[in-house]
A protein has these predicted regions:
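Nucleotidyltransferase catalytic core that binds NTPs
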Residues: 1-124
Length: 124
C-alpha cells in the first residue's frame, strides 16, 4: 500500500483540472470515477471487460502483470491492455517530484500547471 499525499477526492480533482483545464479535453467523452472496491467489480458495474493500465518502465510490468492475472482469476471475461507512456514521461514518478521539490528544484516540467500549483500549496 502506498502512502498518498492527497486523498482520493483531491487526486480526482487534480486529474479533472489536468484534463479539462490544462489539456482542454472534451468533458463529454471522459468519465472520472473514484472507487473503493475491486477493479473487476467496477468493470461489471459499468459493463466493461477491458482494463487499461499504463506502464512507465519494465519495473512496473511485474506488478501490473500479477495484478492482471488476479483480475483475470476474479473475472475471466476481463482483459487487461498495457500502454507504454511516452518516452518523456517514463522517468516521472511522484516520489521523484516530491524529492526535487524538497530540495528546491523546479517541478514545473514534470506536472501540469494546475497540478504544480496544488502540489506547491500542499507541500508548503
Amino acid at each position: 500500500n502506498k502512502d498518498y499525499l492527497f486523498d482520493s477526492e483531491e487526486r480526482l480533482e487534480i486529474v479533472r483540472n489536468a484534463l479539462f483545464k490544462d489539456l482542454k479535453m472534451n468533458k463529454k467523452k471522459i468519465i472520472l470515477i473514484s472507487f473503493k472496491s475491486l477493479t473487476t467489480n467496477l468493470c461489471k458495474k459499468y459493463k466493461s471487460n477491458i482494463i487499461l493500465r499504463g506502464l512507465r518502465a519494465v519495473s512496473d510490468f511485474e506488478y501490473e502483470f500479477q495484478l492482471a492475472g488476479m483480475n483475470k482469476k476474479l473475472s475471466e471475461e476481463i482483459e487487461t491492455i498495457f500502454l507504454m507512456s511516452d518516452i518523456e514521461n517514463q522517468i516521472i514518478s511522484s516520489k521523484f517530484v516530491k524529492e526535487i521539490w524538497k530540495f528546491n528544484g523546479k517541478i514545473d516540467n514534470f506536472l501540469t500547471k494546475s497540478a504544480t500549483k496544488i502540489l506547491k500549496s500542499k507541500l508548503k
